[in-house]
């Protein structure tokens, strides 16, 4: 983290490869049932100050845009695991834990028609200048992998296609409350 400076500052802090492997063990044995992202974007100057002083930088990452592609690449291409693990830990289990199941968490009648169509072989690369967030400084700049969304559907409506937001869907978001 100290090598990358402010762009890598987040809470909890980035961990060693050994720590990451242990977290994967916990996901695979069910100890960790949910995997999520605390997307905390910052203006470029808040992350990448002139001195690259990690103590002065905003404590969050611009990462949500690549969260699913990163997970897909790690689960399917690197670890050779079934992609259903992603649906379980990023959708089904969180919906159950946070009380959204019945509206979110499954592709069933009566649930919101949310889906991501993903091309498992589509290459992707994190490029700071192409981020859609408030800031464009990220410690993941240059990271590459395979498996990228081609279409995102929320409540039956296409909101993103081929890596771009659909303008007509702007403002279609909805605050989700527990259904229990």
Role assignments for model-derived ranges:
Residues 23-25, 105-106, 142:
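Short, flexible, glycine/charge-rich loop motifs used to bind or transfer phosphoryl groups or to couple energy/partner
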Residues 176-180:
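Terminal leader/tail segments of proteins
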Residues 49-53, 109-175:
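C-terminal cap of metal-dependent C-N hydrolases
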Residues 1-3:
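Surface-exposed extracellular loop regions of Gram-negative outer-membrane beta-barrel proteins
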Residues 10-13, 36-37, 155, 161:
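Thr-Gly-centered strand-to-loop micro-motif
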Residues 10-25, 97-99:
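Active-site glycine- and acidic-residue-rich loops that bind
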Residues 8-18, 57-63, 138-144:
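A short acidic, glycine-rich active-site loop
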């Amino acid at each position: 983290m100290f090598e990358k400076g402010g762009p890598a500052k987040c809470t909890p802090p980035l961990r060693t490869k050994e720590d990451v492997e242990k977290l994967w063990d916990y996901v695979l044995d069910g100890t960790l049932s949910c995997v999520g992202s605390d997307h905390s974007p910052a203006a470029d100057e808040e992350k990448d100050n002139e001195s690259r002083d990690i103590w002065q930088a905003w404590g969050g990452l611009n990462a949500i845009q690549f969260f699913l592609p990163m997970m897909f690449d790690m689960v399917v291409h690197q670890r050779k695991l079934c992609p259903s693990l992603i649906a379980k830990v990023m959708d089904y289990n969180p919906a159950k834990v946070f009380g959204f199941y019945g509206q979110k968490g499954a592709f069933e009648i009566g649930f919101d028609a949310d889906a991501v169509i993903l091309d498992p072989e589509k290459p992707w690369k994190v490029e700071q200048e192409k981020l859609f967030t408030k800031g464009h400084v990220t410690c993941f700049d240059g990271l590459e992998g395979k498996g990228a969304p081609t279409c995102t559907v929320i409540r039956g409506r296409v909101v993103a296609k081929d890596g771009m937001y659909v303008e007509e869907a702007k403002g279609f978001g909805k605050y989700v409350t527990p259904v229990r």
